[in-house]
Structure formats: structure tokens, C-alpha cells
Regions:
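Structural signature of tandem alpha-helical TPR/SEL1-like repeats
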Residues: 1-5, 34-43, 67-77, 102-110, ...
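TPR repeat positional signature
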Residues: 8, 20, 27, 57, ...
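Short helix-capping/linker turns of helical repeat alpha-solenoids
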Residues: 14-16, 30-31, 51-54, 67, ...
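Hydrophobic face of amphipathic alpha-helices that form TPR/SEL1-like repeat modules
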Residues: 22-29, 59-65, 92-97, 128-130, ...
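Basic, Lys/Arg- and aromatic-enriched nucleic-acid-binding interface segment
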Residues: 358-394
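Active-site/catalytic core of tyrosine-dependent DNA strand-transfer enzymes
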Residues: 434-519
Length: 519
């Protein structure tokens, strides 16, 4: 470094404003014996002693390209220099405002000022911007200015697109992407990522992404999907599989259907965490007419979707398992999934759960009257009162209500009436899973389990066997004048058998079952 350069640095460090500005300029440009180092140049030009001065702002505006100025958050300095009459600052500020959705009037003002200062490109940009439609405004203003005066048109269009994406401005995002593609920006990973993000934004806003070339859309999806972008893989998989993609024009996937390729992309998206893809995979592989039909794989995809919390998958899996159930464990697993779906508001799942519950004979008994009767029974026999409440909430027969173990039978979704050891006839004594059709029923089961759990030591001695319980219940009902129909369900062995075995239940509930699987 020359002696005069060392002296200039010393003056700058001693507080000379002019020296600071000159050192900063030389570092920004890498001239006059100084290496180019933007960070050091900024440090000199942004010294607190220079705050609010126009000279350092003009140096920044003239020395750095617009994209670098914006990346370094030098918008205020650019505005200060433009207001001071700096032609380069007026041009760059006008262009940057033109790249923003709400900056048209400011852009015309600053570009007009640059045009009056003698900048021919600014005059062309003003004329183009004044006549351009909003969708073409970005391209119109960039074309006469691109690749001149430190202006990289394609790069600026991409930066403006990112800003529009951050602000959720879909229309302006499309305009910026159109400009980037129109100015010859290569469809690299960065631009393809913005195109995919535009599709995602359109999907979130319930709109269709119009205005972009269909080839660019498809190429962007394929490029990003190949790089592991799950959103791109999900969209591409749906489109190639013939599933409607509302966020894209139909022309994008016209003549592009390929089930095997689409299923592969859907599987890639699902594996990356796009949970909705599992259900699409199930539908594709469950369709026997499809070239990728595979019932076993379809079931696997349905289970995956159910595990990820999708109500439709939980309902369909529960319905299929219940239809195939031949053991209590199968029924319990099926009811678990139906209960999960019903908890999310699935009406079909709720209907199927209700089909497993026997109706109480005296449905017209008022809740107030039932509550009063239960209180009377509770004073005489609290264990029986709990059993009666369970019976009415879950639709149990008299045998089931008097023999059920509320502690062992409690489940997160309802109640399991275990095998009745006091009855020899298999069809009457076999265990049965009964779902809670609402939160109130589940609360009754939990209260009963808590009561019997606390009093388990004395419950056996107090209640006796089934014969003793039945005798005590009958005598208490006679004394209190209660009707058994208000608490117990009346069902034949054949009806109970139909609720235990999947094939028989499926025939009994064929209408709601068909609706649940088709919905």
C-alpha cells in the first residue's frame, strides 16, 4: 500500500469525514491500491459520524449494484441519495419500487427523475411501465434496463419474487416469475423453488396458478421433486396419477398421466412427511382397474394414513377391520379407529359406532326421571347404581350389565363386556366391545371404573354372584317401582352374535357401511 493510502487511512481513523468516505469508496470498488472488500467499505461509510449525510449514501448508490444494495438492507441510503439528486440512486430506487406490488407511483416518479437527468433507459422504462398491465409490469420495466448500470434483470426479478412470496402476494409473485423467465433466467433450483412455492401459495389461497408457462411449471415440479422437495413431489404425483390439482391449470398435466411414475412421486412425498399422500396412494392401489392395483399395499397405505391422523383413513380402516373381525381383539382395533375418526367430526364413523350399540327399550324415559331413579338406587346399592348407569349409557342387556367388570373393561373408546362366567350358553356369554357414542357415555364408564377400582376389595363380597345381583336388583326395582326397560336393552342371542362377528354385523349395517367406505 502506498504512503498516501496509509495517510488516508490514518486520517479516516482520526475522524476525517471526507477521508472516511473516500476509504469506503475505494474498498467498495477495489481501486487505487485498496482490495475490494464490501464489508469494510460499509463499516467506514456507516460510521455514526456520517449518519444522515448524503455523501456516503451517494457513494453506496453509485458503487454497488441494486441487488447487493437490497441484500445489504441499504434502502434508506438509496432513498437519501435519490432525494439528493443522485442519478444512479434515482434509477435504482425507481426500479426497485417498480418491482414491488405497491410501488408503481413511486417507480414512475423516481424513474421519471432519472429520465430528466438524461438516462435513456429510464425514459424507456417509464413509457413501458405506464402502458403495461399489472401482470406484465415487472417484465416491462426490466427489459430496457437489464444488464446495464449494475442491474441484473433476471436476478432482480427473482429477488422481487421472493419478496412477493414472503408477503403472500400471489399475483405479483407470478408477475415477477414471468419477468425472470422472460429475461432468460435459467430454470435452476432457486427459480424452480419459487415456482413450486407459487403453486403452494395458490393452493393455500384456494386459487389456480395462472399466467406461467405450463412447460416451466412442469419442469420446475420435476426438478424440485428430484431434489427431494416433498411439496413438489406431492403435486407432481397427484397430477401424473390423474388426481385433480386445483392449484394448477388442467393443461399442465394434459397428456402426461403416468400412474407408476405418479405413485412413485406420491410415495416419495409421503415418506418425506406429506401425510395426505398416503390416502392418495391407498386409492390408487385399491382400485382393481388401476395398473398399480395391489390390495395388500393399499391396506398398508391406508394404515399409514390412519396413523398420521387422517379422519377419512381412520374411518375406512375401522370399517374394513370391523367387517373382517372374527375375534374380540379385531373388533377392539376397529372401534379404536372409528372412535378416532368420530372424534374429528366424521359423521360416517359416528353412524357406524352407533350401529354397534343396542337401543335402550324405554328411550322416552326423561333424563331427570332416570337421574332421580339412579339416586334412589345409589342410596340402597351404590354398585348396582353404577351398573345401571353403564347399562343405559352403553346399551347393555341385563345379563351384561350385571356381570360386566367396569375396571377391566374400560377402554379409551368405550367398554368391553368380558366373557360371562355365570352363563354356559356361548352365544349369550361371549365378550362384546361396545363403543361410547358420545363423551357423556365415556364419562360414565370412567366414573364406574373409578368407583369399582376404589371399592374392589369389598365389591365382590357386597355384590355376590350373578344370581345374587339379579335377585337384589329385581327386589329393589319392585320396591322403588322402577321399570327395567329404562335401563336394560332387550336383544336375542342372534342379535348379540351379529354385533360380535364382522360378517354378520356388515350385513346388518350394510347401508351405513357402504356409505362410509364410499365417502
Amino acid at each position: 500500500m502506498r504512503r498516501q493510502d496509509i495517510q488516508l487511512l490514518a486520517q479516516a481513523r482520526q475522524g476525517d469525514s471526507a477521508a472516511r468516505c473516500e476509504v469506503g469508496r475505494r474498498y467498495l470498488l477495489g481501486v487505487n491500491g485498496f482490495p475490494q472488500h464490501v464489508a469494510t467499505g460499509l463499516e467506514y461509510l456507516r460510521h455514526p459520524s456520517l449518519a444522515g449525510q448524503c455523501a456516503p449514501a451517494r457513494i453506496l448508490a453509485e458503487a454497488l449494484p441494486l441487488d447487493q444494495l437490497m441484500a445489504l438492507q441499504q434502502g434508506p441510503a438509496l432513498a437519501l441519495a435519490a432525494a439528493d439528486g443522485c442519478l444512479a440512486a434515482q434509477l435504482k430506487l425507481g426500479l426497485w419500487r417498480a418491482l414491488q406490488a405497491d410501488g408503481r407511483s413511486d417507480a414512475l416518479r423516481w424513474l421519471g427523475a432519472a429520465a430528466k437527468g438524461g438516462h435513456a433507459g429510464a425514459a424507456q422504462a417509464v413509457a413501458a411501465l405506464a402502458q403495461a398491465a399489472p401482470a406484465q409490469a415487472v417484465l416491462a420495466v426490466l427489459q430496457p434496463l437489464a444488464d446495464g448500470d449494475g442491474i441484473d434483470g433476471p436476478l432482480l426479478a427473482r429477488l422481487a419474487a421472493q419478496q412477493a412470496l414472503d408477503g403472500g402476494q400471489l399475483d405479483h409473485l407470478v408477475a415477477c416469475l414471468v419477468a425472470a423467465l422472460g429475461l432468460g433466467h435459467a430454470l435452476d433450483s432457486a427459480l424452480a423453488s419459487l415456482v413450486v412455492a407459487a403453486e403452494q401459495l395458490a393452493d393455500q389461497q384456494g386459487r389456480s396458478l395462472a399466467g406461467l408457462p405450463t412447460a416451466a411449471l412442469l419442469d420446475s415440479l420435476e426438478l424440485r421433486a428430484g431434489q427431494g422437495d416433498r411439496a413438489a413431489a406431492y403435486t407432481l404425483g397427484r397430477g401424473l396419477s390423474g388426481v385433480d390439482v386445483a392449484s394448477l391449470p388442467p393443461a399442465v398435466f394434459a397428456g402426461q398421466q403416468n400412474l407408476r411414475k405418479g405413485a412413485a412421486f406420491l410415495l416419495r412425498a409421503a415418506d418425506a412427511g406429506q401425510d395426505a399422500a398416503w390416502l392418495h396412494l391407498y386409492r390408487l392401489h385399491a382400485d382393481h382397474r388401476s395398473s398399480v392395483a395391489n390390495p395388500q399395499l393399499a391396506r398398508f397405505f391406508l394404515e399409514k394414513a390412519a396413523l398420521r391422523g387422517q379422519a377419512e383413513a381412520q374411518r375406512k380402516l375401522g370399517a374394513l377391520q370391523l367387517r373382517e373381525a372374527s375375534h374380540l381383539q379385531d373388533s377392539e382395533q376397529a372401534i379404536h379407529w372409528l372412535h378416532q375418526a368420530a372424534a374429528q367430526g366424521d359423521a360416517h364413523a359416528t353412524t357406524l359406532l352407533q350401529s354397534l350399540r343396542l337401543p335402550v327399550a324405554d328411550v322416552d324415559a326423561g333424563e331427570a326421571a332416570v337421574a332421580f331413579a339412579l339416586e334412589q338406587v345409589r342410596r340402597a346399592d351404590p354398585w348396582l347404581a353404577q351398573r345401571l348407569a353403564l347399562s343405559r349409557a352403553f346399551g347393555l342387556t341385563k345379563l351384561e350389565a350385571l356381570s360386566v367388570d367396569p375396571v377391566a373393561g374400560l377402554r379409551p373408546w368405550g367398554l368391553v363386556v368380558g366373557r360371562n362366567p355365570f352363563i354356559a350358553q356361548v352365544r349369550l356369554s361371549a365378550p362384546r366391545a361396545v363403543p361410547a357414542v358420545d363423551e357423556a357415555a365415556l364419562a360414565v364408564a370412567r366414573r364406574a371404573a373409578a368407583f369399582f377400582g376404589q371399592a374392589q376389595g369389598e365389591a365382590g363380597a357386597a355384590e355376590g354372584d350373578l344370581r345374587a345381583r339379579s335377585l337384589r336388583q329385581r327386589r329393589l326395582f319392585e320396591r322403588l317401582g322402577l321399570d327395567e326397560a329404562a335401563f336394560f336393552c332387550d336383544a336375542s342371542a342372534m342379535t348379540l352374535d351379529a354385533l360380535r362377528l364382522g360378517a354378520k354385523w356388515a350385513y346388518r349395517a350394510r347401508a351405513p357401511l357402504s356409505e362410509a367406505l364410499a365417502a
